[in-house]
């Protein structure tokens, strides 16, 4: 019996050992995934939007919605999310997941599944039997075969669009369908429509809004950007095949379940769309180029730098660009007659008198575009609607095709200078010689080359100017702005837009102690204290106590003006000019005013002209501080001339005239 008993014991033990070695298939898939280090694979990290810290610490996903992660630690643990994702695909579906009122992970994450299946070769017999009808219907409706990056030009009346905007267009494979019926992918802050521009800007900078992906018919965006906001669209067809396009589209479906904290400067529309392009081609490392801020026009330049990435470029002019193009091709007398008709000073029959059919067609087409543009700005009255219909009827009688689309009258964004700038200057002033260093995070000022930008505009964020006079031991802040915006939209026969200028930050002025009192507010103690920070100490002409002489101080500064502009920027001429008259207010604060801060009326003129790589400009502001009775008015006149040797460099000769102070300087700027 002993040999038999020993055999039975050995058999039982060996059987137990064999059965203990048999593993759940899910565990096997997980082990294979870890052995392949899929949690470290770039594509997995792209799908979950993981980013490594700049210095040290764990990887962290930029997705901020908890519902995007299947593991409780998924936001910071790629391995845990990988294991939980594999396990979830094999989970039995809940009743609501079968009905698809809620999505099973198998249907919720189609691109995660596709990629993991390509790496692990899942057994289809072990997977739940789900049709994923919602996803199938969605992807079939989009039918992705190509991808375009879209750049919508700058819109100065909206803080979200000061730098332009990026979106993607998913091309459909249906040749019979118009391209405008394709779908566009947008990433934007989900803000309240009741938020003011100031609230939007502050919360946008601080990441106070959730950013979400959304999909619209492309014609909807064309209507919004091209027609309602008169923004040109530049389309860049990317060299992605159908399989790559479908990968991107499948991942967009996955992102519908989450949000990203929206940051105005970095994690914005451009940045998040670049992450989608990396899904299409993981070898592209586009986001690595942007650490501090991401700007839509810089995104366009970046994709054009990637060899072979852009297949074709096309231009979709805005309603105002179409109108200006048609007006440009009219004769001078024809333009005058069109203007008179639009002002109600000429009847339609008189407009067309003595004109051949071709010229009549061109004039009527210009009027129709002008009418559409006017309708985008205001609601037409019944009388105006009737006049519009009369023009349509008259145009239908002329059997002559519209003017063939001409060369764009504006430059594409890639032709513009870099958004960042460093500037080195040397100058002479009332206080003697000085050296100056300036740096600007973004974007464009009045004297910069306008190629790729709104002509004669300024959009600046965080420009700072540090100056050291030769007699000083330490430098001081000459100027600083949180933001500075100058919008000079010209008055035309079609519309009368308001031009405006806003600036918030610090500037410098010259002061003489010609009044007897002084008062320092608590927040301005640094200006008076003996231990004041060297960056904001005044620049005296001689000794500190010599109040009879001119000295220069750094002030808190705020400007806001509005008015009207006259210009020929839409004429198509080589020599362009602008002239703007504005009225508004000026706030200036420092420790030498009795009130601490003065608020006074101001009048301003902005004018300039450009030709080729040359530009001349003058801004003149007059501040009526005399309303307080014991202060003198001040003024600031800033002439300048600029030459651009190349796209990303410029040389300037600038001056400044203020009360008690004058200066002139020569500078060299480099853009990046």
For the regions a language model picked out, list residue spans one by one.
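Solvent-exposed loop/turn segments connecting transmembrane beta-strands
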Residues: 426-435, 467-477, 508-514, 550-557, ...
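Transmembrane beta-barrel strands of outer-membrane/channel proteins
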Residues: 422-428, 441, 462-468, 498-508, ...
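Outer-membrane beta-barrel initiation region
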Residues: 266, 270, 315-458
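Low-complexity, highly charged intrinsically disordered N-terminal segments
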Residues: 54-143
């Amino acid at each position: 019996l002993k040999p038999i008993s020993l055999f039975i014991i050995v058999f039982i033990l060996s059987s137990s050992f064999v059965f203990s070695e048999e593993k759940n298939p899910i565990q096997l898939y997980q082990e294979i995934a870890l052995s392949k280090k899929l949690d470290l694979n770039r594509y997995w990290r792209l799908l979950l939007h993981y980013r490594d810290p700049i210095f040290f610490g764990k990887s962290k996903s930029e997705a901020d919605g908890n519902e995007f992660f299947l593991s409780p630690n998924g936001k910071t643990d790629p391995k845990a999310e990988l294991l939980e994702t594999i396990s979830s695909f094999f989970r039995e579906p809940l009743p609501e997941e079968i009905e698809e009122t809620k999505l099973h992970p198998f249907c919720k994450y189609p691109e995660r599944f596709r990629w993991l299946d390509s790496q692990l070769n899942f057994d289809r017999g072990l997977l739940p039997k789900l049709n994923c009808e919602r996803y199938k219907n969605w992807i079939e409706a989009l039918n992705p075969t190509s991808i375009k990056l879209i750049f919508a030009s700058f819109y100065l009346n909206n803080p979200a669009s000061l730098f332009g905007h990026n979106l993607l267009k998913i091309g459909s494979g249906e040749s019979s369908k118009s391209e405008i019926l394709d779908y566009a992918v947008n990433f934007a802050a989900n803000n309240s429509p009741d938020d003011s521009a100031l609230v939007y800007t502050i919360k946008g900078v601080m990441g106070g809004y959730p950013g979400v992906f959304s999909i619209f018919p492309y014609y909807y965006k064309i209507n919004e950007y091209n027609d309602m906001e008169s923004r040109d669209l530049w389309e860049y067809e990317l060299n992605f095949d159908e399989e790559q396009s479908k990968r991107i589209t499948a991942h967009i479906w996955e992102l519908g379940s989450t949000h990203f904290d929206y940051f105005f400067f970095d994690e914005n529309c451009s940045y998040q769309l670049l992450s989608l392009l990396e899904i299409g081609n993981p070898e592209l490392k586009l986001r690595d180029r942007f650490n501090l801020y991401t700007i839509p026009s810089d995104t366009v330049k970046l994709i054009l730098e990637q060899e072979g990435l852009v297949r074709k470029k096309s231009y979709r002019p805005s309603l105002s660009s179409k109108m200006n193009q048609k007006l440009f091709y009219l004769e001078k007398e024809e333009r005058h007659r069109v203007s008179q008709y639009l002002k109600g000073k000429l009847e339609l029959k008189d407009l067309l008198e003595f004109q051949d059919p071709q010229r009549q067609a061109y004039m009527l087409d210009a009027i129709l575009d002008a009418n559409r543009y006017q309708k985008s700005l205001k609601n037409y009255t019944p009388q105006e609607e009737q006049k519009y219909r009369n023009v349509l009827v008259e145009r239908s009688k002329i059997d002559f095709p519209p003017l063939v689309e001409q060369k764009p009258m504006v430059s594409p964004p890639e032709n513009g200078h870099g958004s960042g700038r460093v500037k080195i200057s040397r100058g002479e002033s009332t206080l003697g010689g000085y050296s100056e260093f300036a740096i600007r995070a973004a974007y464009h000022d009045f004297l910069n080359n306008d190629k790729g930008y709104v002509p004669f505009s300024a959009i600046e964020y965080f420009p700072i100017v540090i100056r050291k006079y030769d007699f000083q031991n330490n430098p001081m802040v000459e100027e600083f702005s949180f933001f500075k915006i100058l919008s000079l939209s010209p008055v035309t026969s079609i519309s009368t837009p308001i031009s405006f200028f806003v600036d918030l930050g610090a500037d410098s002025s010259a002061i003489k102690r010609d009044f007897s009192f002084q008062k320092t507010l608590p927040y301005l103690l640094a200006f008076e204290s003996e231990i004041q920070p060297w960056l904001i100490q005044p620049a005296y002409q001689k000794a500190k106590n010599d109040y009879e002489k001119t000295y220069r101080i750094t002030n808190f500064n705020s400007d806001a003006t509005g008015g009207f502009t006259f210009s020929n920027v839409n004429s198509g001429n080589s020599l362009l000019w602008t002239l703007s008259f504005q009225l508004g207010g000026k706030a200036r604060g420092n420790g030498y005013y009795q009130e601490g801060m003065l608020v006074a009326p101001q009048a301003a003129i902005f004018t300039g002209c450009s030709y080729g790589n040359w530009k001349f400009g003058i801004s003149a502001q007059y501040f009526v501080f005399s309303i307080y009775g014991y202060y003198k008015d001040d003024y600031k006149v800033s002439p300048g001339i600029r030459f651009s040797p190349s796209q990303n460099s410029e040389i300037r000769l600038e001056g400044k005239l203020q009360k008690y102070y004058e200066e002139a300087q020569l500078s060299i700027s480099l853009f990046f």
